[in-house]
């Protein structure tokens, strides 16, 4: 009986961990697609930077910051 209860508990914990991991991945994917409006560029919208162009630093330097979205994400547009 104790073994069965322990097995059910372990399965519940594993399920909760798997579900929270899936939810976190979905939030990260959604965050990368949030559009932000640049001041002076209305009605144009530019996407937040992802991991490649973090803080508006493109590989070729063609991105510039136009607005701060959060403490760790900037709204950028191609210059």
Curated annotation (Swiss-Prot):
Disulfide bonds join 36-75, 38-66, 56-76. Its main location: secreted. The keyword Disulfide bond applies. GO terms for molecular function: sodium channel regulator activity; toxin activity. One of its GO terms (cellular component) is extracellular region. It holds the Pfam family Toxin_4. Keywords: Cleavage on pair of basic residues, Disulfide bond, Ion channel impairing toxin, Nematocyst, Neurotoxin, Secreted, Signal, Toxin, Voltage-gated sodium channel impairing toxin. Residues 21-31 form a propeptide. In neuromuscular preparation of crustaceans, the toxin increased neurotransmitter release, causing repetitive firing of the axons. May affect sodium channels (Nav). This is Delta-hormotoxin-Cpt1a.
